[in-house]
């Protein structure tokens, strides 16, 4: 079975970590010790990852570097840098996990660009949180002194927000499919892909300053690679109804129609669980195949139907 797995950027930079290379390497090693179980069980694996914390950190490093007369790079370049950095980590740590299990599989990462619509309303309405969490006082300083868009992120603190256009298709689609069909484990579409547009007048591709939601990007990837299932890994075993209320209930399986009803009822937090559910719905609707939401340490159990939220066609 071919599985596309979307790994959250926060899984590679956990809360409380300073964000050093060693921190992220340790988190990645822990994550790959779980991911390798999917391969060991006989499945084909395509993996994508978030990059919110990493992209935000690189962006802030660019801003700080300007004080030393080091030119800052555009946001889309920051995204490309995270694909290279996290691609290296994921390749090395998954390769190590495969070796430890005696599994002979090659892992390759691809810098991936995603076409977006230049008229996407997201460019006028930034919603995507990136970077570290700040206190209310720090957020007010960054908003007033630096002009950043800062919002509260699901009760966890304040973060910078940037445009998040809907991904259309990947520039490297055929290369990814060729590698997957040849038996490679492919790491691609990091952070949803580098957002690009086609300048029709110049007939060339250009990057744009935005961050694509990695889950929506992953759903496009899953459909493009003919995945048998699409899995989003987050920090909870199942999506929940009545989140943080006395009658909180885990969703074990639901149809597209049922999940759409839950969205209308406001059960999923914007910027947190909501985009994950929306990405799953997009995949299930376009392919007729199931999507899963679960925690990293429940991934294999979810594939076996023992844990997780499974979304199926009507």
From Swiss-Prot:
Gene behind the chain: CBK
GO CC field: cytosol
Functional pathway: Metabolic intermediate metabolism; carbamoyl phosphate degradation; CO(2) and NH(3) from carbamoyl phosphate: step 1/1
Subunit architecture: Homodimer.
Recorded family membership: Belongs to the carbamate kinase family.
E.C. number: 2.7.2.2
Catalytic activity reported: hydrogencarbonate + NH4(+) + ATP = carbamoyl phosphate + ADP + H2O + H(+)
Keywords of the record: Arginine metabolism, ATP-binding, Kinase, Nucleotide-binding, Transferase
The protein's name in its UniProt record: Carbamate kinase
Lineage: Eukaryota, Metamonada, Parabasalia, Trichomonadida, Trichomonadidae
A GO term for molecular function: carbamate kinase activity
Annotated GO biological process: arginine deiminase pathway
């Amino acid at each position: 079975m071919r599985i596309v797995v979307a790994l959250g950027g926060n899984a590679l930079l956990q809360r409380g970590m300073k964000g050093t290379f060693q921190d992220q390497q340790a988190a990645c090693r822990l994550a790959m010790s779980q991911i390798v179980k999917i391969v060991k069980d006989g499945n084909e694996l395509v993996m994508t990852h978030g990059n919110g914390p990493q992209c935000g950190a690189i962006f802030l490093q660019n801003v700080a570097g300007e004080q030393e007369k080091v030119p800052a790079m555009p946001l889309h370049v920051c995204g490309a840098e995270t694909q290279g950095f996290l691609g290296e980590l994921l390749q090395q740590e998954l390769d190590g996990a495969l070796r430890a299990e005696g599994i002979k599989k090659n892992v390759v990462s691809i810098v991936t660009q995603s076409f977006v619509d230049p008229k996407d309303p997201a460019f006028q309405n930034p919603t995507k949180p990136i970077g570290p969490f700040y206190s209310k006082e720090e957020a007010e300083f960054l908003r007033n002194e630096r002009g950043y868009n800062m919002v509260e992120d699901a009760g966890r603190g304040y973060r910078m927000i940037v445009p998040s256009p809907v991904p259309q298709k990947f520039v490297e689609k055929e290369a990814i499919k060729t590698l997957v069909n040849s038996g490679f484990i492919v790491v691609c579409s990091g952070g949803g892909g580098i957002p690009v547009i086609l300048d029709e007048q110049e007939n060339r591709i250009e990057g744009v300053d935005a961050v694509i939601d990695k889950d929506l990007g992953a759903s496009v990837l899953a459909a493009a690679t003919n995945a048998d299932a699409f899995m989003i890994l987050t920090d909870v075993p199942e999506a929940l109804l009545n989140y943080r209320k006395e009658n909180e209930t885990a969703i074990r399986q639901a149809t597209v129609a049922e999940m759409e009803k839950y969205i209308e009822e406001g059960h999923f937090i914007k910027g947190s669980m909501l985009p994950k559910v929306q990405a799953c719905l997009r995949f299930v609707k376009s392919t007729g195949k199931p999507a899963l939401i679960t925690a990293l340490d429940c991934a294999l159990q979810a594939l076996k139907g023992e844990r997780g939220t499974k979304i199926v066609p009507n």
